[in-house]
Amino acid sequence: MQETFKFLRCNSQGEAVEDKYSLKTLKNHFVVRDEYNNLFRVFSSRDDFWEWEADQPFEQKCFHEVVFGFFPQRLKFDIDFPVNKSYSEEDNDDNVYNILDIIINVIMDVFYETYSLPYNINLTREQILLTDSIGLNKKRELKYSFHIILYTYSVLNNNEAKAFTSKVLENLPKHVYPFVDPQVNKSIQNFRIIGSHKKGSMRVKMFNEELADVFETSMTTKKSDTLITTPFETTCLPCILTHVKEMTNSCDSIQQNELEEVLKFAGVLCKNHCFLRVHKNLVLFKRTSPSYCEICKRMHDKDNTLILRVAGNKVYQHCRHDNKHSLLMGSLSGTTNFVEIYVDQVMTKSIEVHESILFEELPDTQKHIYDESSMREYERVPTLVVKAQMKIGKTIQLRNYLQKYYGNDSISKQQTIRFVTFRQIFSKNIQTRLPNFTLYSEVTGDLDSYERVIIQVESLFRLTSTAEPVDLLILDEVESIFNQFNSGLHKYFAPSFAIFMWMLETANHVICLDANLGNRTYNILQRFRGDVPIFFHWNQYQKAQNDMYYFTSSREIWLNNLLKDLLEDKKIVIPTNSLMEARLLQTFIQKKFPEKKIGFYSSKSTAHERESHFNNVSYYWGLIDILIYTPTISAGVSYEDKRFDVLYGFFNNMSCDVETCCQMLGRVRELKSKTYKICLQGKQNYFPETIEDIETFTLQKRDTLFQTINNHQLSFTYSKETGRPIYYKTPYYHLWLETMRIQHLSKNHFITRFINQVADTGAKVFILTGEKLETVKQYTSIKMEIKHQDYVNIASAETIDANKALLIKQNLKEGITVDQQDLFAYEKYKLLEFYAWHGNKITPKFVEQYNSFMTKQNYTGRVQISRGKTVHESLTMLQTQELNFHQWAMQHAEHHDLQFNYSFQSHMYAIMLLTKCGFKCVQDPNILTNEQLMTKLVDEFVQYDLSAVSFEFKLKKPNKMDPQTILKFINKVLGIRYGLKIHHNKGNYYIKNTKAGSLIPFVRQQIKQSPCVVSNLLPITETFSTKEESSPTREETSSIKEKTFTET
């Protein structure tokens, strides 16, 4: 039943709704404005309206709900994108998709502040209803409009709605604010009804399932959920105009320097979110993947649930789904350093530092776990794995085992034993403890005739497989042994690895020992000795419980602590995994304290010096005041005397893994003060971390070598001639995957893994404090001096020919001492050879610019991509070359294949990204307008998965797919591969060199001034059309994610 009225309010021109109905009686009716017939209709119920509305002609469905301000109503927002207007700020273009996402996030954030924290009322995205009306307006112009409705809640009246809307508008970014209509909460408000359109327009307000899926909002299609006036089906929110519980306004806003520190907490504990924005004392995040919530104790896969709240100097973690509880994450330390923040977490036992390994999950019958200051007797089992900290007696108990089962009174005294080590010096160290073993380096010829042999992995080729397996295979520092097979130092890799695997698979007994035992050893033993059970012998005694570790990420604080101890005449040990840092420290200390004696050992030390000193460290290290060394010294070298006072370690994630760094700390066994002061630094990396991801990435690079390139779309199909490759997964392949996993974990999580492993030994950890003096400026200037001197030494070195260069290379590989001047001459030769620049004089500046990793990488990329007349031809040539190598390597030397850096796929991805942007090749001179490029980016990339490209270039996958974020990602790829970028200038985009790329220009003919890339690519003559396209239809705009707005 319905009644019609010409007017809503009383007047002299005709009957109005107000003439017949009071506010009280209207509460039980549903009032609709009929725009088409210019009438107001009053229905006895909403159901009556829906029944009547269903029978009306489409063109007459122009209905609006009349919302009276004094009635309870849902919170609503009208989002409108005007035609022919830029929705961006210069280089910060945001498409509709991102603007909507921003608005929804701000609504949720303001709701959290206004209702969640004070009243524990939660809002999820599933409680948000999103409708659209996209299409052509009366002028045949494309227009986008959306309604956002919080359909499960209501507020008391329009004034409460106004207050909430105002708070939302206050928090919107400036470039987003204009799209939200602030005038939708008037005392009488007409709000379009679902299924209706404006008179003369075909833009119908409707549910959009695809839109709901994109934004993870409600999938409801219940029409009554879209109505604003709410008689009974919602929860009424507390009034915010009359009484407000403030939990944020009374708090100071987070400052920029504090924000950096707060974000570190999220980096540690919340890896599935990215930073969104700050609101007063709240740090808000956007979800990027599902994660487990420690507050709710369950997985969350939707909503931006994570919020960090700063109260005083405390940082709390909150979840939008549970506002009664929070987690104390730590305190603001006054620094902005991640290391200090994480150490604070360890100190307060807020996180678990022990990383359990698969051995711990073995059944009780297969493990012996205890906590004692010395080792118990080893079990006589086929596969024994021993884990214990250093200096608890692992080697002593091994000697007892050998004496018991292989001594003079044993029936196995003549059985074959092979003791494998990973370093030559370690082998000699072991022989001093096991004098009845033969050291491989002290005998020549056949080693099989010796019953007991200590042998380093690189020399395993001197053994042969026999009909009878060895009785006992000992792998001391087993994790390091596995690492060594991936070192690239093997002269005879294939026979060495083959004999190793034969012994591992067939030995009657295997004993593996390591303080840093990990899952790699378990997986390898399970795969290749799975027919016999593993027995795990673990002494959990924490020998290091009296050691004190002080950590910092501040080089200044670390240096000033070091200087203070040197001034107090303390004797210092300085291990570092950076050769440059080691040289810098040596020079810095020599200048400050010329009277002090420094022992310095690195890969640049002569073979004679390393051999003589490492075999008698007690003598040589007893002569020095300061010991500096790189990973040249790890396991196998031990100084037992109590001479040194403090250890200062400097480590980063650009070199060896965490386990090797921790081994370096134990080369001086007894520190007088038991004090270790460590500076840790590491940039964020994005290497694949699981065996599955690493394998996928590895096989994919080889898979593409067998595919045919589609020239038009730069896509792949399998060649009929070569077919799809079949990969034979050999033992080395599985070991290589395990080793890559460990390396990638260290590169991605270096700092946390380092601190965890130290704390897991029982050592006490603290934050290293001190003043930040001006020392670092002098330190930095010395670094520049060292680098410049290297450039000078290389530039002024003798110019040698290929024969002498080959001799130096062979001597280095054989471990034969090479004169320092010859080393510089060899570096000079390699530089000239790389750029084909022989016969040209070079300067120190030339060395600085052209000997950099990035310049060389860009040069190689440019040469490879410009060999053919087109990029397609160049790609095909590179693909053929690498395919031939791959097929040869798989037939002759698989380890070469896994260690080879295949570049074809990286080129394929880089060129694919470039062409999707609208450019034809790396030398394309054409210019794209802002509109052309932004349209390309949206059409080509909004729904494109960049995971494979991220893996290839070790880049973080973009968290959002708006045009500018995509373009930044593309420019990183082009910069890495070619030294190029898509540059923006005055509304136009074109290809431009990066700083490194400008050093190696593309040319048609060789030039004399500097190295260059002689390109065979044909000139690009075709220009891009600027012809305007016709307006798209409704069907062409069905996917909101594929559309953007740009300047015209």
Curated annotation (Swiss-Prot):
Provide this UniProt record's keywords sorted from A to Z. DNA replication, Early protein
Segments carrying the region annotation (Disordered) are 1025-1048
Q: Explain the induction of this protein.
A: Expressed in the early phase of the viral replicative cycle.
Task: Name a biological process GO annotation.
Answer: DNA replication
The record's disulfide annotation reads none
Q: Which Pfam families match?
A: Herpes_ori_bp (PF02399), Herpes_UL52 (PF03121)
- GO MF annotation list: ATP binding; DNA replication origin binding
General function of this protein? May be involved in DNA replication.
Family designation = Belongs to the asfivirus F1055L family.
Q: What is this protein called?
A: Putative helicase/primase complex protein
Native organism: African swine fever virus (isolate Pig/Kenya/KEN-50/1950)
